[in-house]
């Protein structure tokens, strides 16, 4: 992982202890329910995916046993493992669309363009879904899915900034 732009040691924070994650995995396995974890950034996503990767699907139907919410800047290895094990990723391209200034300030242009590698995830077989993240999105109508879809299809922010054309979806 790399730190936020202009820092040497700021990577984000973990809000879930290892013991809490283990208890969530144990509960979901016992009750055959889907584990849903929130993870943004390479380290957080790798931590969740690596832990879940050690398990076999415990669901009694074809529902993915793990859903990782808020996928932003996943490592290549996490994408591969998620595809291999049938994990489900949820991501919000609306953020690069609606909050482009923050992405450019904190990540820079090159990193921003790779934050939401949706084309790569789909091409590698990851089960993927977009969401608006309403009401947290700072857009005029947070629950409107169309700006999110527009961002995924055009890979342009509201102001026209290129957000990584190689990751467009159709």
Summary of predicted features, one role per range:
Residues 88:
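Ligand-binding beta-strand-loop-alpha-helix segment within the catalytic cores
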Residues 1-32, 79:
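Active-site-adjacent helix-turn-beta-strand microarchitecture at beta-sheet edges
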Residues 26-36, 43-66, 71, 77-80, ...:
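His/Asp/Glu-enriched, well-ordered alpha-helical/loop segment
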